[in-house]
């Protein structure tokens, strides 16, 4: 990091009037060299991608909305949205703010009832005299703010001429209350008094009223009854552990320590009397701290407890945090109190969150502002299959798949029919015919009776079908979309199994996103898609969809009216199920974040992370309905 970048970054969190007469003279936080952000150094098995493009501004915070969009605060007063991986051109919100020093738009949060009331809360510095920080509520109207919807929730104390130590983090806790981190405005004495809100964590109701069970409700007066914890210098970031009541507060120190504090009601964390660990019984020591030889300003803070597991399970319950100046991300284990290195070489991280897809997102203030997504390399999909009732016309079975990567992929494709009778399938297709087509419908290869063409190759690959009337082929395919079409010879009908095998799993290309379209009947004639995951680092993160009603707009005359979806493992144990994809909010948010939201509410979807093994997705009709359905299995990285 250059000297210009380093001092610029440090001033936003650390410099006080005692250490620097003029913050701008020391290099204000928003003045950063426009250098390209280098790729972070990550552990083996992880990868990083830019998410959404340049923000063209100085970001301060970000938060995922309950529906999966990413909202990003710019210090100058704009809230930008990244939706389905793209930065929207129109800001969600544009405010007039005082953005001098560390002031500006500093935090955003979403009401627990966002799907109903569409309330969005922000923390910003009012630009008119007397200058102060404020929490306001706005109503979302899609991807923009409803005009005239601002409701002031809380006005904080008037600020001195010092423009640093504003805090700005705000999050709703598991109790439905709004928690707010407030800096001490470069005056340590503020942190030790109940006569103002500075240097504190506050707790209020969503409408701005103060809960009567706050720890200082009966000892403070007026708005100061909102104080929940005190003795903090600049709690710029904090986080709640999803599904738990635990809260970690990151406090930026002055000359010695950066702190992670256990957020406990009524606690006094000691600033300015003490910094870092203390034996004073009046103060609560941090649960983790580090000295300034490895960093200068703690930021971020996110527990790894996502609705969809994308990282290896060993990360569950761990706490990710970053340092603004040192440009690293570390992982804290609350159980052991130990930390491990995770990422280094980041330009200027200011915030990080775990997304609804289970990936880790960090906000980099360098190069005009960027978001980066860190994900575990998923396990390899080794083979995929679809079992369905094969009819004529639109009722043939179609299994689609995608080859990704930079080198061609060698695959084996089979159409199994007669040998299914050995597994109790009474109406098996007696003579399947197999076609492999490109996305434009052109033929790659075809086969009827596997011994006719590639017998030696199929036997060498271990793919020789059990019955001579079954079809199989081997092809080497460049990246692209492909369809394996199974029909009955001479118009024959019955249940068949289409299989696609990865015959070169160690190459840089992969099989992904399998789909099968066929008629869904009852009993053994339901639609089944099986897949096997191999053993790379990390779980395989998949999204599975069962589509029916929306097929009508593609010319399917008899789509399945209401598909139901179930996922089982090799032992037949049910792992997940869905009927109507919007029923489960967390899962719906993950599906939406992948850009895979079905167009009809009656269609089903599952987002899940899977360990190496064999899995089966099953589509049935609700109340024994029948019709054509499409099952899709997406490999999400």
PLM region spans:
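Surface loop/turn motifs at the tips and blade-to-blade linkers of beta-strand repeat domains
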Residues: 50-55, 92-100, 154-161, 227-231, ...
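Conserved blade-ending motifs and adjacent loop-strand segments that build the rim/top face
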Residues: 338-356
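Beta-propeller domain segments
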Residues: 41, 57, 103-105, 113-115, ...
